[in-house]
């Protein structure tokens, strides 16, 4: 469907018909490969080698089909068909796992289609949206017209704008992250 696709990390297993499918929903902001960084650093591959059949929703880059999509459209036109495909593998409900913002999308999917979801796992999913204070709210309100203008011009928010918004939410986050990377032994397993 559009730029989105469902990646099956258990399709090559000899026992794929017996492996338990789990539909993974990443954030719309991060690419799906955050859950499959490399052959040695991959949650999807590790789960596949340990008896599960991970199905990863890859949003791709928004194309013409996705221009103007809101969250409802991503849930109804992308996630619901992915859930249907996952259910075809088992003939019944499946586990759905959401990562970061994908957890909110997975939760919405589970609420819309409870008969299709056996279990729900939420990983690093934001849940507190009221603790940012009045200063953040006022600034976001003031930025609204500019963001609307960018959406009208590009049809989506450019990734640099999204990154700036995330950085703005915690200005020290980026410098702390790179300071920690710089302090690591570059040959250590953690640095991989």
Predicted regions and their residues:
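A structural signal for isolated positions on well-ordered beta-strands in alpha/beta enzyme cores
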Residues: 55, 95, 119-121
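Conserved catalytic-core motifs of eukaryotic protein kinase domains, centered on the activation segment
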Residues: 66-68, 133
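Alpha/beta-hydrolase active-site loop
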Residues: 68-88
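Alpha/beta-hydrolase-fold enzymes
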Residues: 105-192
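A structural boundary/capping signal
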Residues: 14-15, 82, 87, 110
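Short, surface-exposed "cap/lid" segments of acyl-processing enzymes
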Residues: 1-63
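Short helix-loop-beta connector
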Residues: 90-93
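Gly/Ala-rich beta-loop-alpha elbow adjacent to hydrolase catalytic centers
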Residues: 97-102, 106
């Amino acid at each position: 469907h559009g730029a989105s696709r469902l990646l099956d990390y258990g399709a090559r297993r000899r026992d794929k018909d017996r492996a338990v499918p789990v539909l993974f929903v990443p954030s719309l902001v991060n690419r799906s490969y955050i859950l499959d960084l490399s052959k040695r650093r991959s949650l999807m591959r590790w789960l596949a080698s340990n008896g599960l059949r991970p199905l990863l929703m890859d949003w791709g880059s928004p194309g013409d089909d996705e221009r103007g999509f809101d969250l409802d459209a991503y849930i109804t036109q992308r996630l619901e068909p992915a859930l249907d495909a996952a259910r075809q593998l088992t003939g019944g409900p499946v586990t759905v796992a959401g990562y970061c913002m994908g957890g909110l999308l997975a939760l919405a999917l589970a609420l819309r289609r409870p008969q299709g979801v056996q279990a729900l796992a939420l990983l690093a999913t934001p849940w507190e949206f009221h603790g940012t204070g009045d200063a953040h709210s006022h600034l976001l309100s003031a930025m609204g017209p500019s963001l609307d203008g960018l959406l009208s011009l590009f049809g989506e928010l450019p990734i640099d704008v999204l990154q700036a918004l995330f950085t703005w939410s915690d200005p020290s986050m980026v410098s702390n992250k790179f300071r920690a990377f710089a302090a690591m032994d570059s040959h250590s397993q953690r640095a991989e």
